[in-house]
A protein has these predicted regions:
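Short N-terminal signal/transit or membrane-insertion segments
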Residues: 7, 63, 230-231
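Conserved phosphate- and dinucleotide-binding cores of soluble alpha/beta proteins
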Residues: 155, 161-325
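Short hydrophobic "helix-edge" motifs at membrane interfaces and signal-peptide entry regions
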Residues: 9-14, 47-50, 285-287
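Short, glycine-rich nucleotide/cofactor-binding loops
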Residues: 3-6, 132-136, 213-218
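N-terminal active-site beta-alpha-beta segment that forms phosphate/nucleotide-binding
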Residues: 18-187
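A generic structural signal for well-ordered alpha-helical surface patches
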Residues: 8, 12, 31, 51, ...
């Protein structure tokens, strides 16, 4: 566990993916503003810190949402109250996220339960990347329905995409599921399609870093290909998200800023050697180049539905407006 004591440490933690997952990035950014206020309550310093936080990762909308909410709250108060109010607002943001994720699980449970009642056998769920309690304040988004189903006694098994290049599925989602004693199997990223063809996937549930008001979904690279495979094989493809992940301003997926990360994340892998020491090794020829796009966009037409804290809706402007406007 790493303690963050300054706003600069918060920015670096987000940028270096020491914290990751859209809701958790938002919570970290909120407390980053608290740390900025604690360091120097000069409005100019706080504004510059807010800008740097927003710029630390461009794709996940929760980051900007949380910083904007914090700055709006601080603009309404006197300087002698600023630290207490900032701390209270950051806590409210995190408490809300936990409750939202719990509600996502309650609503998503209905879908899993319906599949189980028809199948009368283990429900096989495919997920991508990590959208669990390691990516949120608690419960997770995509994993929350799974945890609720497991707690209710519904037998579930999860296909866990390894999610190259950082292997968040293999390293984080599988770890979470093991801790919750939920059966899971790690698969290579390109395995999902054949599993769907074989009828071994009942439902896909993924998270999202930014969902547009028209239902387009921006998530970890590889999500789009899973949605295409699911569509071709008539497998339901759901996206789980809190309302803080909705971008009401950008109207087309092509306009979402897609983060390009260091190519070394792709060309090198980290792991434990036989002595349990962490090692990083190059897996490509020295002269080869690599491009590391962190996210892709899944058009709304491939999304069966959005699982939110207020219920389930179709991935469309009309569906989202019915719940949130």
């Amino acid at each position: 566990i790493k303690e963050l004591k300054t706003v600069k440490e918060s920015i670096n933690a987000i940028k270096l993916m020491e914290v990751r997952g859209a809701p958790l990035i938002g919570g970290t950014a909120a407390y980053g503003i608290v740390l900025a206020v604690q360091e120097n309550n000069d409005p100019e310093f706080i504004k510059k810190s807010a800008d740097k936080l927003i710029q630390s990762r461009p794709t996940a909308i929760n980051l900007k949402w949380a910083v904007d909410r914090m700055m709006k709250k601080l603009s309404e108060i006197n300087s002698d109250q600023i630290l207490d109010i900032a701390l209270k607002e950051a806590k409210e943001i995190c408490d809300e996220d936990e409750k939202f994720c719990e509600n996502i699980g309650i609503h998503g449970l209905e879908i899993i339960e319906e599949i189980y009642n028809k199948k009368k056998d283990t429900v096989n769920i495919l997920t991508h990347c990590n959208a669990g309690w390691l990516a949120t304040i608690n419960w997770g988004t995509a994993t929350s329905p799974i945890y609720h189903a497991h707690k209710k006694g519904i037998p579930v098994h999860v296909w866990v995409d390894e999610t190259r290049p950082r292997n968040q599925g293999a390293n984080l989602t599988s770890y979470e599921l093991n801790e919750e004693e939920i059966p899971n199997t790690i698969i290579a990223d390109n395995t999902g399609g054949i599993l769907m063809q074989r009828g071994e996937v009942d439902i896909c549930i993924v998270g999202t870093d930014r969902t547009l008001s028209n239902g387009d979904v921006c998530n970890k690279i590889g999500t789009y290909l899973k949605a295409l495979a699911a569509n071709d094989n008539n497998v339901p493809f759901y996206v789980a998200l809190p309302s803080s992940t909705i971008d009401w301003e950008i109207t087309e997926g092509k306009n979402i800023p897609i983060e390009i990360r260091n190519s070394e994340e792709l060309s090198h892998v980290e792991g434990l050697d036989e002595n349990n020491d962490i090692k990083k090794i190059l897996i490509y020829p020295n002269k080869s180049k690599a491009m590391n796009l962190a996210f892709d966009v899944t058009p709304a037409k491939y999304v069966t539905g959005l699982i939110t804290e207020k219920g389930i809706c179709e991935a469309s402007s009309e569906g989202l407006k019915r719940l949130f406007k």
